[in-house]
Amino acid sequence: MSWFKRIRVSNTSRVVALSSMLAFGIQIAFALLMLRLFTPQQVGEFSVISQIGFFWMTLALAQTPLSLLANQHIPAHSAAKQAWHASAMRALGLLPVAALAIGFSQLSMWPTMLWVLLLAFCQMGWMLAQSLTLRAGSSWQQAAVRVLPPLTAASTALIGALFGSWMAWTGPTLVLSALIGYAVGAAWLIPAWRERKEPNPNEQALSVERPAQESVKHAPPSDPRSATLRMAHTLADALLATAIIVVWQRLYGAEETGWMTALLRVLGFLPAVVHMAWAQVALAQGRHTQTSQTALANPWWLGLAAFACVIVLGLSCAVALYQKWLDPRWHGVWAYIAPLVLWQGSACLSAAFSHRPFQTKSARGYSWACIALGLLQALVLFAPIGLAQPIEAEQHMAAFALMSSLGLLALAVWMARLR
């Protein structure tokens, strides 16, 4: 790898990291806005609707954004267009699954189905747009596609809350705000439908540094998994992420769900930042695994630093509750701070190594390991439903977070050993 290419990867990673951190700050502001201006029940219902939409979108994508980054032999714009068509068709086929999830959550089918559909398709476009800009976008485009959607959503939620208090309007402010934000993000996918005669300057700069024989000797990271395995991996991840919200709604009610999801929304963004600013950039730039001890240590330091940030955020939330800066109705968040910090901190360590399987041709093993972990997590999550006397929400989350953390740490150790 040439000096120029190293510098370019570093700059791209820095841009994505900074923009992701800015988006993270906006997400925190959005979460604080929900804590101050909305009730736990409103936050809980919004979390259920948005999570079902996320579940639908994730299944429809079937890890297509990751494949779009890993398989660089396909032109970026053509690949994005094909990915959208295939994902949209899968989304339509999964409509009954989304309806089943809504029914299980015990929310009214209408207009919940409409909101879920709109959220799913707009978020699907935004996810593909992020991968597209990583491969074929400028630095400012890579930053804007990450920052503008959450900024739009937070601004809309604030305006909607103020308008609602002034006009006594009780409409779905949070859902509308999220929908507008996702729509702004999906708009960045429009360039995929524009024919481009000339090569993209970003991709051209990389090709200048690559000798003709390098494509044979050093193939870029790829995704060799079958479509069935990718779908199974996606299904396991999406089902678990949605089941957490839906099971909490069913067993413990909207208020308890609001306490859990509000904190999870803040802490859960850090693993996403690590994945976007580190793993995805490494895949998008065709970066190969380095064998030096220093290179191997970098993901550990990155993951540990992110873990420390999760701890700081958890402590900040505890201080806010202790100092009574939040409404007394949010006192129930106390029980979720420690387990969620442990769970999401472990997720940061795992995310720091998530590019390694694709660089070492171990993607199949990675998918099977993630599926196995998801099954173990599901057993812990659904166990109280079959008990004659359900356990308390605090005990349930403690058991689930412990199992998840141990599994994620084991996964991180395995990925760190890949060569």
Segments predicted by a language model, with ranges:
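Membrane-interface junctions at transmembrane-helix termini in multi-pass inner-membrane proteins
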Residues: 122-145, 344-370
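Signature of the first transmembrane helix
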Residues: 8-62, 228-255, 265, 401-405
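Interfacial segments at transmembrane-helix termini and the short loops linking adjacent helices
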Residues: 40, 104-116, 316-348
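Hydrophobic alpha-helical transmembrane segments
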Residues: 113-122, 143-196, 372-377, 390-418
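Interfacial transmembrane-helix starts/ends
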Residues: 76-92, 224, 290-306
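Transmembrane helix-bundle signature of multi-pass secondary active exporters and lipid flippases
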Residues: 50-58, 260-280, 310, 340-347
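Helix-loop junctions and terminal segments of transmembrane helices
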Residues: 27, 58-77, 263, 267-291, ...
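N-terminal membrane topogenesis motif
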Residues: 1-26, 67-68, 192-197, 201-233, ...
